[in-house]
């Protein structure tokens, strides 16, 4: 199994294999997930002080905040998957 990485903005990269969901931060349930992760010490803020536009949830229950749109992250995720398929 090859490690796939996704750029989530500002030079920050996450492992594509660990991503469970990429969501928008506006809904109340997602805001609760962010608050709970902060309380557990499992919140990673990769926004560099900018507005949070995407919330990435991993299989290890870490929550990553990104300043780029969820659609952009998802497109990078799909492109990463497509490159692996073509290479194999």
Swiss-Prot record:
Signal peptide start-end: none
Residue ranges that the Swiss-Prot or TrEMBL entry lists as coiled coil: none
Pfam families noted in UniProt: RemA-like
InterPro entries reported in the protein's UniProt record: RemA-like
Bilayer-crossing regions: none
Protein family (similarity comment): Belongs to the RemA family.
Matches recorded under HAMAP family: RemA (MF_01503)
Protein name from the UniProt record: Putative regulatory protein Npun_R3866
């Amino acid at each position: 199994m090859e490690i796939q990485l996704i750029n989530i903005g500002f030079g920050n990269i996450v492992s594509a294999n660990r991503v469970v969901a990429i969501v928008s931060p506006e809904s109340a349930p997602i805001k609760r997930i962010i608050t709970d992760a902060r309380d557990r010490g499992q919140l990673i803020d990769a926004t560099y002080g900018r507005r949070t536009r995407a919330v990435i949830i991993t299989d290890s229950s870490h929550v990553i905040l990104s300043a780029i749109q969820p659609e952009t992250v998802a497109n990078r995720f799909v492109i990463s998957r497509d490159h692996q398929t073509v290479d194999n």
